């Protein structure tokens, strides 16, 4: 078990982290997600031991790494670190990068390096290559192998996939998650990419202004965000004002079931795109009627602007487009799920 307990950090008069508490179980994967300047990288640096908190405690396996009386240096923490773009030593070969820090004979070190290359699916023929001679994805695997060589109990990943192209980023992320799980190494990923966080982690911590706004499973923070800002940060969301009563919200898109039967009065609600079904209207349609005013077609997802004959308001939303809808097309709007009701 790794724990942060009431950890705070200031730089000058700026409160960068404020009373952060987080628990990680062995072999688990946690993503810390938030906008630039929210404190993500500073938090990783405190965990790694590159910086020290002003207050609070950091423990691993019940032993203090930082407390008012203890401060374990970074090289003694058994924590691996993979920074952005790998940060390989340019003057060392792939083999030398991975073997850096392994205290063993030359023969034993080479044996361990080969085993690590196999573990991260790197061709052994790359061992004598220089970092600039291999691809970005291969460089990240070298950085991961180098970190794993220290047999860490915890792995820190500071936006390590951000420099990769979209397809390579997804495959490298999946391979990294699988590898860490197989090795039983707990991992903390820092990212500003919500999709990356949701797909990588078993626990999401949303950080904002140096505080955790919400911590929970990816499913919980996505479908039950604590507030509007968290909802919009984690993905496309339709935020509406509604009159809530008896388990339903009356709003611009009609009467929508809500996730809190106790909620009453004027409230703000959230709908994700998934339960919104938009189809060309047919004769005798009983669903809510609207007209496409504008469409920004982007393949799988499109941005639609809808107008309603009996309402002055318009509605703009991102949604799956089953077929190309042209401006002027009458459509039917159906809600197949529940809306999230935010606290009053």
What label would you give each PLM region?
Residues 56-67:
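Conserved ABC transporter NBD signature motif
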Residues 250-295, 322-344:
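Glycine/charge-rich catalytic "coupling/switch" loops of P-loop NTPases
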Residues 54-57, 209:
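Conserved coupling/switch loops of ABC nucleotide-binding domains, chiefly the family-specific signature
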Residues 78-80, 93-229:
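ABC ATPase nucleotide-binding domains
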């Amino acid at each position: 078990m790794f724990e942060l307990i009431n950890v705070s950090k200031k730089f000058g008069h700026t409160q960068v982290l404020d009373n952060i508490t987080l628990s990680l179980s062995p072999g688990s994967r946690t993503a810390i997600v938030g906008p630039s300047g929210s404190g993500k990288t500073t938090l990783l640096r405190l965990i790694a031991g590159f910086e020290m908190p002003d207050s609070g405690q950091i423990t691993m396996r019940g032993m203090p790494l930082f407390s008012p009386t203890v401060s374990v240096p970074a090289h003694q923490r058994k924590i691996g670190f993979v920074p952005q773009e790998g940060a390989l030593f340019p003057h060392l070969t792939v083999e030398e990068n991975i073997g850096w820090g392994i205290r063993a004979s030359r023969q034993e070190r080479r044996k361990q390096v080969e085993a690590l290359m196999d573990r991260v699916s790197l061709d052994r023929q790359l061992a004598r290559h220089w970092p600039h001679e291999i691809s970005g994805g291969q460089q990240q695997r070298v950085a991961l192998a180098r970190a794993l060589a220290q047999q860490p109990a915890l792995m820190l990943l500071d936006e390590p996939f951000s420099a990769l192209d979209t397809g390579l980023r997804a495959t490298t992320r999946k391979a990294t998650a699988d590898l860490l799980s197989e090795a039983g190494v707990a991992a903390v990923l820092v990212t500003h990419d919500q999709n990356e966080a949701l797909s990588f982690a078993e626990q999401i911590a949303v950080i904002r202004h140096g505080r955790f706004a919400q911590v929970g499973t990816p499913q919980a923070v996505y479908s039950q965000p604590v507030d509007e800002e968290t909802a919009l940060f984690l993905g496309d969301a339709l935020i509406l004002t509604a009159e809530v009563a008896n388990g339903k919200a009356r709003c611009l898109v009609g009467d929508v079931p809500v996730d809190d039967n106790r909620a009453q009065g004027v409230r703000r609600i959230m709908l994700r795109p998934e339960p919104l079904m938009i189809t060309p209207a047919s004769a005798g349609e009983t669903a809510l009627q609207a007209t496409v005013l504008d469409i920004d077609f982007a393949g799988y997802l499109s941005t639609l602007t809808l107008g309603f004959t009996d309402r002055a308001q318009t509605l703009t939303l991102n949604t799956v487009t089953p077929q190309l809808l042209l401006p002027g097309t009458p459509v039917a709007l159906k809600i197949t799920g529940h809306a999230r009701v935010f606290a009053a």
